[in-house]
């Protein structure tokens, strides 16, 4: 199994952009190499949809723009999109049989903005069905395998994105994060990934799971690469009702407000130019309890020690409702999912049962056949907690708890620390099938990421070591910031990556 494409010979996105500008390599060469690598690594099952003609057409357009001097900041950079973003030309399934064969007539805003910047898409990436899962085992099209150890899960729900980046099939990928679905697979696959502040990246064209939680974010080898993508992806979008006006900028010719290379870059520059001496790193005691595996704890502690050597100060903090984030999330997210997924009934689009008697039977059969077990489970939970007899007892209580969780974070940032650091996941990647008989075990894997999502804060995962019995399963460090603090998070990650090489390590070839 070939694990890397031509782009790896040039380094990160900035170096690759320079190589393209100097004509040391062409966008077509990069695209063809990526397509070849993706085919050779098909055993990972990271890609769901590849169309070489579409990819090479984009690459030729990028080469033409480079020759004409009109290239965007990502011209020719090979990327791929999680199959939760609708894409004109490529099928979009959200990892579900329900949407098998669906072709969107438009691009998601994230896809559109990256295309406008010149990025070349190699295709659509596998994911847990409707982004519901922590191991990418819930896809209707089979599980994704972790490039570091193909017996292991890559994490989820953006497992295809993390696996493709880790295997160096693409320079970067898009993902979505509802309860940890960018950060957790990034950690388990040894790549960098960031969930921005809720509302800073448009959700338009992103297939909805939990609308008050869903947020798009990029995955790439390094924090500098993440900054390159995030500066293109962020910005106010009037087509998304949850898009924040705080991200506005100049309107383009179409009238759509866009933000360019500003807030995240400014925060990155400001934080990157300052010494770390005196930076207060909050370390939650609840993140280092009995549930944290020793190998993960050791890697995270070593990363914290590295920051201390750089001048930062470690400060103990408390997030007392950390474990309560699990029940709060698994009330709120399923409630929103049950509403969002009600549209898939086989009438307008989506899977339609072949045999049925009347309209009601057609809808019930179509949904029974089209949805997988985990999606059905969450729809049932969501319907239950929204029912008349239980709405107050479950849903409203969960929303109250959500507010208290957000207040815990704000109290820590206001009085005690500048950023918060800890593990992303309590363990390294499990083997595929380990939790097949206990589906709720995957829910517990997000204990350190759910509170951040409920609060709407930005957070990222940075590779910080390895664990597992053979020492080859990656561990991620989670860096959490206050609202709109993405630039600082990326700058801190970059300072760490300047003195460590975890993000530069790639898995050796192995048969999948």
UniProtKB/Swiss-Prot annotation:
SUBUNIT field: Heterotrimer of A, B and C subunits.
Source organism: Bordetella bronchiseptica (strain ATCC BAA-588 / NCTC 13252 / RB50) (Alcaligenes bronchisepticus)
Organism domain of life: Bacteria
Gene: gatA
Example GO biological process: translation
Entry EC number(s): 6.3.5.7
Job of this protein: Allows the formation of correctly charged Gln-tRNA(Gln) through the transamidation of misacylated Glu-tRNA(Gln) in organisms which lack glutaminyl-tRNA synthetase. The reaction takes place in the presence of glutamine and ATP through an activated gamma-phospho-Glu-tRNA(Gln).
Single annotated GO MF: glutaminyl-tRNA synthase (glutamine-hydrolyzing) activity
Cysteines engaged in disulfide bonds, as pairs: none
Catalytic class of the enzyme: ligase
The protein, known as: Glutamyl-tRNA(Gln) amidotransferase subunit A
Alphabetized UniProt keyword annotations: ATP-binding, Ligase, Nucleotide-binding, Protein biosynthesis
SUPFAM superfamilies: Amidase signature (AS) enzymes
HAMAP family on file: GatA (MF_00120)
């Amino acid at each position: 199994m070939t694990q890397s494409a031509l782009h790896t010979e040039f380094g990160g996105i900035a170096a690759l952009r320079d190589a393209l500008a100097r004509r040391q390599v062409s966008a077509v060469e990069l695209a063809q190499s990526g397509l070849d690598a993706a085919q050779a690594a098909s055993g990972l099952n990271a890609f769901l949809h590849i169309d070489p003609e579409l990819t090479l057409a984009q690459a030729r357009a990028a080469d033409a723009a480079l020759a004409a001097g009109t290239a965007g900041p990502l011209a020719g950079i090979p990327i791929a999109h999680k199959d939760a973003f609708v894409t004109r030309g490529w099928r979009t399934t959200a990892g579900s049989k329900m949407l098998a064969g669906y072709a969107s007539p438009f691009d998601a805003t994230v896809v559109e903005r990256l295309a406008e910047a010149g990025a070349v898409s190699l295709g659509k990436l596998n994911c847990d069905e409707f982004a519901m899962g922590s191991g990418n085992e819930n896809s209707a099209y089979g599980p994704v395998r972790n490039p570091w150890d193909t017996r292991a899960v890559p994490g989820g729900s953006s497992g295809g994105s993390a696996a493709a980046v880790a295997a160096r099939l693409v320079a970067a990928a898009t993902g979505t994060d509802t309860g940890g679905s960018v950060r957790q697979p990034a950690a388990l696959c040894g790549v960098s990934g960031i969930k921005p502040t809720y509302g800073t990246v448009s959700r338009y064209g992103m297939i909805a799971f939990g609308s008050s939680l869903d947020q798009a974010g990029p995955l790439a080898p390094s924090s500098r690469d993440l900054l390159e993508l995030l500066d293109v992806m962020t910005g106010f979008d009037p087509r998304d009702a949850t898009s924040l006006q705080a991200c506005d900028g100049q309107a383009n010719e179409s009238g759509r407000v866009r933000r360019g290379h500003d807030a995240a870059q400014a925060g990155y520059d400001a934080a990157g130019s300052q010494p770390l001496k005196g930076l207060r790193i909050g370390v939650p005691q609840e993140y280092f309890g009995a549930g944290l595996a020793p190998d993960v704890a050791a890697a995270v502690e070593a990363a914290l020690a590295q920051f201390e050597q750089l001048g930062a100060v470690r400060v103990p903090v408390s997030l007392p409702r950390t474990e309560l984030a699990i029940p709060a999330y698994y009330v709120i997210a399923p409630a929103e999912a049950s509403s969002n997924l009600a549209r898939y009934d086989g009438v307008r689009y989506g899977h339609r049962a072949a045999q049925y008697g009347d309209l009601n039977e057609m809808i019930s059969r179509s949904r029974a056949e089209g949805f997988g077990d985990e999606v059905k489970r969450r729809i049932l939970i969501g319907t239950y907690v929204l029912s008349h007899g239980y709405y107050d007892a479950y849903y409203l209580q969960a929303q109250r708890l959500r507010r208290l969780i957000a207040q815990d974070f704000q109290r820590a940032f206001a009085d005690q620390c500048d950023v918060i650091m800890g593990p992303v996941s309590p363990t390294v990647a499990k083997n595929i099938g380990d939790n097949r008989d206990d589906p709720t075990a995957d829910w517990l894997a997000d204990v350190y990421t759910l509170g951040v999502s409920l609060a709407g804060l930005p957070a990222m995962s940075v590779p910080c070591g390895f664990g597992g019995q053979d020492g080859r399963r990656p561990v991620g460090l989670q860096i959490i910031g206050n609202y709109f603090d993405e630039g600082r998070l990326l700058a801190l990650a970059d300072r760490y990556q300047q003195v460590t090489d975890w993000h530069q390590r790639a898995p050796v070839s192995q048969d999948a």
